Amino acid sequence: SGKSFEQLAEAARTDWNSELEHFEIEGTPDQKAMFYTSLYHTMINPSVYMDVDGSYRGLDHNIHRAEGFTNYTIFSLWDTYRAEHPFLNLVKPGRNADMVESMIKHEQQSVHGMLPIWSLMGNENWCMSGYHAVSVLADAITKGVFSNVDEALAAMVSTSTVPYYEGIADYMKLGYI
C-alpha cells in the first residue's frame, strides 16, 4: 500500500478509537479493561468473507456476489448466539443484519438447506449440536434489525426440519427425542 508500519499502526488506532467512542463506561481500571477487551473480541469474529468486489466462495463451492450486504463467515454460533449477536443488534445493527443475511445465504447455498451450525470459510464443520442461528435470526427480526421476515422464516423452517440432523426425524414422528 506504500504506507509505513507506523502509518498503518496509526490508521488502526484511529479506526479502533472510532469504535470505542460509541461507549461511555464507568468502573475501575480492571473493569474498563475487561469491557474493552470483550468489545475487541466481538469485532474479531464473525469475519468478513468476500473480496473487495463482493465475490465469495459459497457453501456450494460456487462463486457468489454479496449484493447489498457484507458477507461474513466463522459463525461459532454455540458461543455467540446468547450474548454477542444480541449485543451487536444493539450497538452494530447493520453489521449484525449483514451477518443474518450471510447466514440466510449459507442456508440457500447448502445442500442440506440449513443455516450455519459452525461455519468456517465457506464450509460447515458440524462441530456443535443444535441450530442456534434460529435464535440469532429471531432476535434480529424482533429488534427490527432484519426485515426480510419471509426469507428468514423459510430458512428457519428449512433448518429445523432436516430429518437426518440431531434426531429431528424422531422428534417430528414422536414429539420427543
Where are these predicted regions, by residue range?
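Acidic/polar, glycine-enriched structural segments that form the non-catalytic walls/loops
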Residues: 1-71, 105, 113, 146-165
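Aromatic-rich carbohydrate-recognition surfaces in CAZymes
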Residues: 73-177
